[in-house]
C-alpha cells in the first residue's frame, strides 16, 4: 500500500511540475517583449578593457528618455525609486553626457534610438585614429577633429542600439514614463561578457578570441610573373562603430570598395597582353585595430618560412599553419608602386562646373616616395584631364605626413633598411587634412553620409581604371559598366541582400545592413570565423578576375579543386584570388594548450570577449498602489492554496487512507 501511495505522490508531483514549467514559460512570454537590438560588446586590451557588459543575468530598470536639454537636466532630480535604463535620443549619446550621467546618478543601462540621426558631427574614435601603430606615433596632427575616444572607454553596464521601428516604439513608451502615466515601462538588458581583467587573463581563461579576420588579394594573372614590377592597388576593408553590428563604414571603406570592385569589372575587359607590370588588388582586414591585415601580409612576404608542407595540399603549410601559400609568388622587392584609396566618398565641391554644367569635386593626393609618387600623380591627373566632362579633379595635399592609412605598413618596412628602395606611394582621399567624414567610426557613417552623385562615382571608376591600365602598360582605353556600379554600390553601402549576393552566395545574411566590423579571427590558426561580407567580396573578386571555368555540375566550393575557385551555378570559376590571415603579430597559437597567447606587445593587442547571447526585453510596471494590491492578492491566494492543500490531504487521509 505504501508503494502505491508513493507512485501516486510522484505522479502528482510530475504533473504539477510540468504544469508549472509550462505556466512559467507562458507567463514569461506575456510579461516580456523581446526587442531588435545591437549590443555594445567588450574588448580586452593589454592593460584593461573597453566596451560594455551587463551583470550576470542582466540589468533592468524604468525607461527614462533623454531627448532635450530639459529632460537631461531633470534626470539628475528624477525621484524614481527604481533603477533606471536611460533611453538616449542619438543627439544626446556621446562620451561627455554619458560619463556625467553615470558619475552623478545610478544608471543600470542605456538604449540608443536610431530613428533620428545626430544633427551635429560626431565620432567616438580618437582624434588621430590608432596613432601609436602608425608611421608617426609622435604626430601632433588631429585628422579626426570630431573624435572624443568614446569607443575606448569601459562601462560596467549594458548599452544597446535599437533598430529603426523599435526606436519609434520605445521613444513613445518612454515619453509615457516621463509624463508620470501608468502602466510605466521598463526594460531588461542582458549582454553579460565572459571576459574580464585584460587580454592576457582573458585568453588564458579561454573567454576571448583575437580581433582579426581575412584580408583578400587578387590578380588577373593566373600566376604572378616574378620578373615584372608590381603595382599594388589597395584599401582597408573594415570599419568600426561603437555598436559594432552597425559598422557600415560607408565613407571609411564601403564607397572605396565599390570603386575597387567596379575597377575589376572594368579592367577585366581591357587587353592585358601589353601589360609589362603585375597589378595586384588588395583589401586589408582589421586595419582599424592597428593596421593588422597589411602588417601581417608584409611580415609574411619577408619572413614566412614553411618547414613542413601539408601532405594533402602542396600549396598549404602545416608548420607553421598557413592554408594558402600563393602569396609567396609576390616578392616585396618587386613592389614598384602602391596606390591606396582611403575615404573617398565625400569629395569637396570645387566650385567649378564641367562643360555640361555638372559640379566638379576635389580628390586629394597624399604622396610618398619621391619621383615614383610624382609619376603616379601625373598619370592620374592626365587621366581625368582626358575626359572633357569629368566631375573629379585632383589636388596635392598641404600636409607633410600621410593620413592614417594601410600604406604605412609597407613604408615602415622600407624605412628599416639602411639603403631604402623607395616605393612610389600615393594615397587618394577626399580630404586634405582633417577628415571630411563627420561620422568617422560612428553608426551614422552610412549610405546617407557619402556623395550620392552617380556621375562622380562613375568618373572615379573610369579615371582610376584608366590610370591603372596606363601604369601597367596598356593604352588606357576602358569602358565602365554603369549598371554594375549602381548594383554593387547598393550591396556595399545599403543592403547586403542585393542580387549579386543571391547570385554568388549559398547563404543569406541575417542582417541586411552591411557590417564591416572585422570580428574575431577564430579559435585557431586554421579555424577562421569569416563574416558574410568578407566572403561576398572574396567571391565577387574571384568572379571578376576568373581566368578559366569548368562545368563540373558542382554543388559547393568543395567540389572545385583549389582554394581560389568557387562554384557558381554548377560551374567552377578559377581565379588568382586568395584570403590572407589578418591577425596581429602580437599573438601566437599554443598547440599544447589549444589557445592564443601574447608573445610581442609592440604590436596591437585587442581580443573580444565571448558571450552566450544578448537580449533586450520590454516589460510593464504598475503603480505603487497596484503593486501593493498584487502583493496582498498574492498572499491571500497563497494562504487559500495552502488551506485547500491541507484540507484535501486531511480528507484523503481520512477517507481513502492515501496520505
From Swiss-Prot:
Keywords: Glycoprotein, Membrane, Notch signaling pathway, Signal, Transmembrane, Transmembrane helix. It holds the Pfam family Nicastrin. Residues 23-627 are extracellular. One of its GO terms (cellular component) is endoplasmic reticulum. InterPro entries: Ncstrn_small, Nicastrin. The chain crosses the membrane at residues 628-648. It is found in: Membrane. Homodimer. Component of the gamma-secretase complex, a complex composed of a presenilin homodimer, nicastrin, aph1 and pen2. One of its GO terms (biological process) is membrane protein ectodomain proteolysis. Belongs to the nicastrin family. Disulfide bonds: none annotated. It is a single-pass type I membrane protein. This is Nicastrin. Glycans are attached at residues 94, 172, 305, 389, 451, 475, 550, 553, 600. Residues 649-659 are cytoplasmic. The gene is ncstn. Essential subunit of the gamma-secretase complex, an endoprotease complex that catalyzes the intramembrane cleavage of integral membrane proteins such as Notch receptors and APP (amyloid-beta precursor protein). It probably represents a stabilizing cofactor required for the assembly of the gamma-secretase complex. CDD domains: M28_Nicastrin. Residues 1-22 form the signal peptide.
Amino acid at each position: 500500500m505504501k508503494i502505491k501511495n508513493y507512485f501516486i505522490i510522484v505522479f502528482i508531483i510530475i504533473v504539477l511540475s510540468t504544469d508549472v514549467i509550462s505556466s512559467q514559460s507562458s507567463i514569461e512570454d506575456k510579461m516580456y517583449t523581446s526587442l531588435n537590438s545591437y549590443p555594445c560588446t567588450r574588448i580586452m586590451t593589454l592593460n584593461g578593457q573597453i566596451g560594455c557588459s551587463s551583470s550576470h543575468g542582466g540589468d533592468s530598470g524604468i525607461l527614462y528618455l533623454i531627448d532635450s536639454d530639459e529632460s537631461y537636466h531633470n534626470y539628475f532630480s528624477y525621484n524614481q525609486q527604481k533603477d533606471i535604463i536611460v533611453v538616449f535620443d542619438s543627439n544626446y549619446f556621446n562620451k561627455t553626457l554619458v560619463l556625467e550621467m553615470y558619475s552623478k546618478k545610478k544608471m543600470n543601462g542605456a538604449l540608443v534610438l536610431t530613428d533620428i540621426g545626430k544633427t551635429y558631427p560626431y565620432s567616438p574614435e580618437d582624434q588621430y585614429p590608432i596613432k601609436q601603430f602608425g608611421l608617426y606615433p609622435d604626430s601632433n596632427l588631429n585628422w579626426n577633429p570630431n573624435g572624443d575616444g568614446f569607443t575606448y572607454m569601459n562601462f560596467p553596464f549594458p548599452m544597446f542600439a535599437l533598430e529603426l521601428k523599435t526606436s519609434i516604439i520605445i521613444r513613445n513608451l518612454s515619453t509615457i514614463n516621463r509624463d508620470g502615466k501608468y502602466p510605466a515601462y521598463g526594460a531588461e538588458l542582458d549582454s553579460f561578457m565572459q571576459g574580464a581583467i585584460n587580454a592576457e587573463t582573458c585568453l588564458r581563461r579561454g573567454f576571448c578570441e583575437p580581433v582579426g579576420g581575412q584580408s583578400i588579394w587578387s590578380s588577373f594573372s593566373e600566376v604572378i610573373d616574378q620578373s615584372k614590377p608590381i603595382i599594388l592597388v589597395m584599401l582597408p576593408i573594415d570599419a568600426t562603430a561603437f555598436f559594432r553590428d552597425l559598422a557600415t563604414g560607408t565613407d571609411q571603406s564601403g564607397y572605396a570598395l565599390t570603386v575597387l570592385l567596379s575597377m575589376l569589372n572594368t579592367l577585366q575587359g581591357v587587353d592585358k597582353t601589353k601589360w609589362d607590370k603585375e597589378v595586384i588588388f588588395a583589401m586589408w582586414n582589421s586595419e582599424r585595430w592597428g593596421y593588422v591585415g597589411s602588417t601581417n601580409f608584409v611580415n609574411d612576404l619577408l619572413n614566412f618560412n614553411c618547414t613542413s608542407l601539408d601532405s594533402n595540399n602542396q600549396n598549404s603549410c602545416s608548420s607553421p599553419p598557413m592554408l594558402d601559400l600563393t602569396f609567396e609568388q609576390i616578392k616585396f622587392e618587386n613592389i614598384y608602386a602602391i596606390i591606396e584609396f582611403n575615404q573617398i566618398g565625400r569629395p569637396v565641391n570645387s566650385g567649378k562646373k564641367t562643360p555640361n554644367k555638372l559640379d566638379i569635386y576635389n580628390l586629394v593626393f597624399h604622396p610618398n616616395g619621391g619621383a615614383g609618387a610624382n609619376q603616379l600623380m601625373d598619370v592620374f591627373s592626365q587621366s581625368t584631364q582626358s575626359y572633357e566632362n569629368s566631375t573629379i579633379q585632383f589636388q596635392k595635399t598641404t600636409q607633410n605626413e600621410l593620413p592614417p592609412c594601410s600604406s604605412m605598413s609597407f613604408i615602415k618596412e622600407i624605412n628599416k633598411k639602411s639603403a631604402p628602395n623607395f616605393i612610389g606611394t600615393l594615397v587618394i582621399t577626399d580630404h586634405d587634412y582633417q577628415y571630411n567624414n563627420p561620422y568617422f567610426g560612428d553608426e551614422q557613417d552610412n549610405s546617407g553620409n557619402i556623395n550620392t552623385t552617380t556621375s562622380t562615382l562613375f568618373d572615379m571608376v573610369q579615371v582610376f581604371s584608366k590610370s591603372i591600365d596606363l601604369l601597367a602598360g596598356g593604352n588606357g582605353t576602358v569602358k565602365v559598366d554603369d549598371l554594375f556600379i549602381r548594383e554593387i554600390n547598393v550591396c556595399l553601402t545599403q543592403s547586403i541582400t542585393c542580387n549579386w549576393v543571391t547570385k554568388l552566395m549559398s547563404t543569406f545574411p541575417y542582417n541586411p545592413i552591411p557590417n564591416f566590423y572585422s570580428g574575431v579571427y577564430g579559435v585557431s590558426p586554421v579555424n577562421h570565423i569569416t563574416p558574410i561580407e568578407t566572403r561576398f567580396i572574396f567571391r565577387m573578386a574571384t568572379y571578376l578576375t576568373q581566368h578559366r571555368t569548368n562545368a563540373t555540375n558542382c554543388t559547393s566550393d568543395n567540389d572545385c579543386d583549389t582554394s581560389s575557385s568557387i562554384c557558381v551555378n554548377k560551374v567552377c570559376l578559377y581565379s588568382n584570388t586568395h584570403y590572407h590571415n589578418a591577425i596581429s603579430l602580437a599573438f601566437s597559437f599554443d598547440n599544447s594548450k589549444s589557445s592564443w597567447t601574447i608573445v610581442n606587445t609592440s604590436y596591437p593587442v585587442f581580443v573580444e570577449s565571448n558571450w552566450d547571447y544578448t537580449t533586450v526585453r520590454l516589460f510593464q510596471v504598475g503603480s505603487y498602489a497596484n503593486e501593493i494590491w498584487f502583493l496582498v492578492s498574492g498572499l491571500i491566494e497563497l494562504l487559500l492554496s495552502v488551506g485547500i492543500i491541507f484540507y484535501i490531504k486531511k480528507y484523503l487521509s481520512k477517507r481513502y487512507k492515501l496520505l
